[in-house]
Regions:
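Structural detector for tandem alpha-solenoid helical repeats, activating at a conserved register
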Residues: 44, 81, 100, 115, ...
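N-terminal secretory/membrane-targeting helices
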Residues: 40, 156, 165, 254-255
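Amphipathic alpha-helical scaffolding segments comprising HEAT/armadillo-like alpha-solenoid repeats
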Residues: 25-37, 58-74, 95-108, 130-142, ...
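Short inter-helical turns and helix N-cap capping residues of alpha-solenoid HEAT/ARM repeat scaffolds
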Residues: 7, 41-43, 78-79, 112-113, ...
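Extended, charged alpha-helical interaction scaffolds
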Residues: 141-143, 148-159, 170-175, 182-183
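Structural detector for internal amphipathic alpha-helices that build alpha-solenoid repeat scaffolds
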Residues: 2-25, 47-61, 83-96, 115-130, ...
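Short, contiguous, helix-prone interaction/anchoring segments in small proteins
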Residues: 33-53
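Eukaryotic acidic, Ser/Thr-rich intrinsically disordered low-complexity regions
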Residues: 213-255
Length: 255
């Protein structure tokens, strides 16, 4: 029976059982339950498992080295679901101690399967939101990587931090302004739009875009900002007309 076929109480009991069995595995170095949960076909079972690992790491300092060693072992498994769940578990740890799990993301970016790579992007988002300094410093190293997909994924990964704190990621986005790859460019424009519609954010974005050298890209970005205020009109701090008026008044050369 799938996770969400269970009742709310049954789900809570299952999550508790998963946590207990993983804790027992780590204490006894067996890893049977850990391996099974990390490989489970049910996304929510795997999620419960990696969240449990993150909680155990935080609450039981004596098991931290064991957890890192175990994740390293599991990261070499052939099953991509296990490798994906390892990265998600590392992402939970990286919310507080990124340096201890950085190697999992260095490796996961180049995984042969898209699922672990996507887990890296998801982890960058959740870690960057609460632990931005080391995560963004790490991301910056890959902004000019020769693989265009790596550049695109990093650009996408830092977006969530920028939703509330655009000033933190705009200097990194600026480094991509002359990227010649269409997919990277379109992702860059998309991210600029995504970090510009919440309260106080359009002002920060515009103040940065004024200094960008690639005026053609700036124009694309401004059009995206206007359109984002239409698409997200129920959530945006300004209406589409207000956003367009603000841009015309503050960066008219871009439109």
């Amino acid at each position: 029976m799938a996770f969400y076929d269970l009742s709310k109480q049954e789900r809570a009991e299952l999550v508790s059982e998963i946590g207990k069995r993983i804790f027992d595995d780590l204490q006894t170095s067996r890893f049977n339950a850990l391996h099974s949960y990390f490989a489970d076909d049910d996304t929510y079972i795997r999620k419960s498992a990696y969240l449990s690992v993150g909680r155990i790491y935080t609450t039981h300092s004596t098991l931290q080295i064991k957890i890192i060693e175990t994740l390293k072992t599991l990261s070499a498994e052939d099953n991509f679901k296990i490798r994906q769940t390892v990265i998600n578990a590392a992402g939970e740890i990286g919310k507080h101690e990124f340096e201890n799990v950085q190697e999992f993301f260095d490796k996961g970016l180049f995984d042969i399967h898209h699922s672990p790579r996507n887990a890296v992007i998801g982890s960058i988002k959740k870690m960057g939101e609460v632990n931005p300094l080391p995560v963004l410093a790490w991301a910056k190293k890959y902004l000019h990587h020769p693989d265009k997909e790596i550049r695109r994924e990093i650009c996408h990964g830092i977006e969530l931090r920028g939703r509330k704190h655009p000033a933190d990621i705009l200097p990194l986005l600026r480094e991509l302004q002359f990227d010649k790859t269409r997919r990277v460019r379109s992702t860059l424009v998309h991210v600029i739009g995504q970090v510009a519609y919440k309260k106080g954010c359009i002002e920060t974005v515009v103040s940065h875009l004024k200094d960008w050298e690639n005026k053609e890209l700036v124009t694309e970005a401004l059009k995206e900002i206007i359109d984002v205020h239409r698409r997200y009109r129920d959530f945006a701090a300004m209406s589409q007309k207000q956003a367009e008026k603000y841009l015309l008044e503050n960066i008219p050369e871009g439109l």
